[in-house]
Regions:
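Sec-dependent signal peptide recognition
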Residues: 1-7
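N-terminal signal peptide c-region/cleavage motif recognized by signal peptidases
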Residues: 13-15
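Domain-level representation of secreted and single-pass membrane ectodomains enriched
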Residues: 19-172, 177-180, 248-252, 392, ...
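Generic structural signal for well-ordered beta-strand positions
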Residues: 89, 214, 360-361
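Serine endopeptidase catalytic core focused on the charge-relay Asp
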Residues: 110, 120, 130-194, 198-200, ...
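Short, small/polar residue-rich loop motifs at catalytic or cofactor-binding pockets
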Residues: 199-202, 344-348
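C-terminal subregion of chymotrypsin/trypsin-like serine protease catalytic domains
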Residues: 208-209, 256-258, 326-334, 344, ...
Length: 410
């Protein structure tokens, strides 16, 4: 399955001179294949089956649908989305489409087929499924981009597969429940295909407040810009783990961001149609204490867009590394650490925890496989210290950042 792709960074717009930034090729991780659709749903034909396939012809393991209501009509209605067996997966309401130009993405819908049914409305009501992002089974190929040995030593958080078959210890469940996959679908650059082509990707992130999600700045995707399109098409799934509970969110606001520290803090809200499966999130604890080389750590992530994984029995290698935008350390600030937790594309934004389950760093870069004058080859993974992120936000005079300091108790 080809749910992962490695972007050629030379083809992407850059927010900083490429020669001054160490950015390996794993920054953008493909997740799902876009299929343009034009499926009308009216009272005269209120129910339609949707069966998108991946680029290589596989049936989808899950999908997201892009839905519009060009004419919502005058009467209330709802749109029920059910799986092959008739289980209700999501329900959208007329109020989710405030205007005829409104479109929205559903959350992740499991299964190879869904049925979309219009309930209510009037003769003028016209809803349209405009596209689907179809994802095949999770990719478990061992690509070997940023791992220490011949095979990755991460394992499924809940089952322990494929290595030890021992689940993670119970005291790590609370931190794990705050970790989720970030998935986005936006219009692709013109060079990527015909008009209307979309591109999708995944990252990892973690809840640091009741409705605040922390991930990497570069997880804004190919445009490297947290604009309205990226925000509007994103979904965050805190239960991408084959579990029974749906915990999916959309992004309402980018509260804080910084390229040098490669972080973005997103304010989130329950995704349309997903309210019934969402409860208040329980954020992680954060530690800004000094980090020491050799310190024991673990990382929870979605490498290769797989269900929730854990990389443990790993350690901090260096506690003093310059920022990715200052690879030679000219600015003097040592805002990053290096570590040996196995990672792959999709783990960008993954939280790194100390043995007490406190968030100490945010993973953002893997091994530097290709050398450049500014960036020599290395075999270390990199993460941004939470102390650096906290210091940056607390030092800002921006009223929005000062309000964030109060909200987070920093």
């Amino acid at each position: 399955m080809r749910c992962i792709w490695l972007a050629v960074l030379a083809l992407l717009p850059s927010a900083a001179p490429a020669q001054n930034v160490c950015r390996p090729s794993e920054l953008v991780t493909r997740f799902g294949d876009w299929k343009a659709l034009s499926i009308p749903i009216r009272l005269s034909a209120p129910s339609q089956d949707i069966t998108p396939k991946t680029r290589d012809g596989q049936l989808a393991a899950s999908m997201r649908l892009l839905i519009a209501a060009p004419n919502p009509g005058a009467k209330p209605w709802s749109l029920a989305i059910r799986d092959r067996d008739g289980h209700l997966l999501s329900q959208l309401e007329r109020s989710d489409f405030p205007s005829a130009s409104s479109t929205l993405w559903t959350g992740r819908l499991t299964g190879s087929m869904v049925t979309v049914t219009l309930r209510g409305g009037d003769a003028d009501t016209f809803v349209e499924v405009r596209g689907a992002s179809a994802s095949g089974p999770p990719n478990s190929d061992q690509n070997g981009f940023s791992i220490s040995g011949a095979t990755a030593q991460w394992r499924d958080f809940y089952t322990g597969a494929p290595h030890s078959h021992a689940p993670a210890p119970p005291n790590r469940r609370d931190p794990a429940e705050a970790v989720g996959i970030f998935v986005d679908d936006t219009l692709a650059p013109a060079a990527a295909g015909p008009p209307g082509t979309r591109t999708s990707w995944c990252c990892t992130g973690v809840m640091i407040g009741r409705n605040l999600y922390l991930t990497n700045w570069h997880c804004a995707g190919p445009k490297r810009l947290w604009d309205g399109e990226v925000r509007g098409n994103a979904v965050i799934d805190l239960a991408w783990e084959n579990g029974p509970i749906r915990r999916q969110f959309s992004v309402s606001e980018v509260v804080a961001q910084n390229e040098d520290l490669d972080f973005a803090i997103l304010r989130i809200q329950p995704a349309a149609g997903a309210d019934g499966g969402v409860r208040t999130t329980f954020p992680v604890q954060i530690s800004t204490a000094p980090i020491s080389p050799g310190q024991s750590i673990y990382m929870i992530h979605h490498a290769q867009c797989q269900p929730k994984l854990i990389s443990d029995n790993c350690h901090v290698q260096s506690a003093s590394r310059a920022a990715w935008t200052d690879p030679l350390g000219g600015a003097g600030a040592k805002t990053e650490i290096t570590h040996d937790c196995d990672t792959e594309p999709g783990a960008s934004g993954a939280p790194i925890f100390d043995p007490q389950g406190r968030l100490i760093a945010l993973h953002h870069l893997g091994h530097q496989k290709a050398a450049s004058p500014m960036c020599p080859i290395d075999n270390v993974n990199k993460a941004v210290k939470m102390s650096a992120i906290s210091d940056f936000i607390r030092a800002s005079v921006d009223p929005k950042y000062q309000a964030l300091v109060v909200e987070l108790g920093w």
